[in-house]
Amino acid sequence: MSISVTSHNDVSKLERIGAHSHIKGIGLNDNLEPKESSQGMVGQVKARRAAGVILKMIQEGRIAGRAILMAGPPSTGKTAIAMGMAQSLGSDTPFVTLSASEVYSLEMSKTEALLQALRKSIGVRIKEETEIIEGEVVEVQIDRSITGGNKQGKLTIRSTDMETVYDLGTKMIDSLTKEKVLAGDVISIDKSVGRVTKLGRSFSRARDYDAMGADTRFVQCPQGEIQKRKEVVHTVSLHDIDVINSRTQGFLALFSGDTGEIKPEVREQINTKVSEWREEGKAEIVPGVLFVDEVHMLDIECFSFFNRALEDDLAPIVIMASNRGITRIRGTNYRSPHGIPVDLLDRMLIISTLPYSHEEVKEILKIRCQEEDVDMEPSALDYLSTIGQETSLRYALLLISSSNQVALKRKSATIEESDIRRVYELFLDQKRSVEYLEEYGKNYITENEWSASGAQDNAVAMQED
């Protein structure tokens, strides 16, 4: 007699951990006082308080068309504060992230790319009234033709006060079949589009079955009228409206991504229409946030465009980040603070970030270990904090996952100081890499050698001719 054993393989959920996935907000209380460590944010008290004031004004809709510059050395949390602001604003307020190098493309001009990013950052909250049918299904009758013709049926639906019978067409029957609507289900039907939504199962049918699925939800039978008018709010960006009205394929261009350049006339017509909706009370503008990282990579034409775009009445809040000091403005020979023209700097509120202390680096590394589900001994954490203080925070963060692999190799679930030392010897940081280049630089091929060898090859080719 043979016994068959069935093995079960657990399918692990794919989870990607990003550089800022541990950040849930900017860590402020109701009085805009920053906590030392909260919502994944550590240190940078002054910068977070300033960001909190900006955040409060954005939420209240008081400011728009302002520019904020976050300036500070590398690895001081500029992008982290911006990501924290995005988390605090929520999904209803548009927050668009743009790297300055994304602007340069062969398919569209620089100003068009910036203008599309600006209009993605402005939301339009459109209100409309729709008529819905809401109630508990008493009976669904479907008559199918023997010859395969159109299906017909009747839907009996009730509330606590009344009961009504509706005639069903082919499309409505297909929608009910797709949602698997049965007698006893509480449903909602949008009359304008014919969309059927199953809200749950009525409490009166709770004893129909002995066993129920985990996703079964019981709700009360709706009260009052079966047909009701309901206000629905949709939030779309101005860019979405631009794309739908500018392309022949309409909304399909949103999914293909091939938006191309949009004519100014189309945008003017949309701005006029949105202004009419605002006056009629049908829509309201939601000024969002455009975050431009590595802003010093933009050239003088882009900065000139921002000078004009920020003065527009439909302009979002633009947050820029730069880690440059006094450097050359791209496209010119002039030097300026942060690589940004002085006339644009004059329009900005500047938030500065400072290097982290040893204790702050240690706290950030501890939060990242929790995020990556890694156990680390206190001595190893101290040593890694020292490395982060002497080299850079990013380098120390990268050593967490690699040292965890070394620990797993020796069958240990906890990272020890020896594991950190091992990966520190294997992977160079920026300072040690420069020292290595200075020591062994003569063995590398340099630009001068390439140019010399190229000239020699040209001379040989000319002699052969």
From Swiss-Prot:
Catalytic activity from the UniProt record: ATP + H2O = ADP + phosphate + H(+)
InterPro entries documented for this protein: AAA+_ATPase, P-loop_NTPase, RuvB-like, RuvB-like_C, RuvBL1/2_DNA/RNA_bd_dom, TIP49_P-loop
Binding of ATP, residues: 72-79
Top enzyme category: hydrolase
Keywords: Activator, ATP-binding, Chromatin regulator, DNA damage, DNA repair, Helicase, Hydrolase, Nucleotide-binding, Nucleus, rRNA processing, Transcription, Transcription regulation
GO biological process: box C/D snoRNP assembly; chromatin remodeling; DNA repair; regulation of transcription by RNA polymerase II; rRNA processing
Disulphide bridges, residue numbers: none
GO molecular function, one term: ATP hydrolysis activity
GO cellular component term, pick one: nucleus
Gene3D superfamilies xrefs: 1.10.8.60, P-loop containing nucleotide triphosphate hydrolases, RuvB-like helicase, domain II
Keyword Aminoacyl-tRNA synthetase assigned: no
Transmembrane segments: none
Location in or out of the cell: Nucleus
Enzyme nomenclature, EC number: 3.6.4.12
UniProt family annotation: Belongs to the RuvB family.
Subunit description: May form heterododecamers with RVB1. Component of the SWR1 chromatin remodeling complex, the INO80 chromatin remodeling complex, and of the R2TP complex. Interacts with dil1.
Role noted for this protein: DNA helicase which participates in several chromatin remodeling complexes, including the SWR1 and the INO80 complexes. The SWR1 complex mediates the ATP-dependent exchange of histone H2A for the H2A variant HZT1 leading to transcriptional regulation of selected genes by chromatin remodeling. The INO80 complex remodels chromatin by shifting nucleosomes and is involved in DNA repair. Also involved in pre-rRNA processing.
Name listed for the protein in its UniProt record: RuvB-like helicase 2
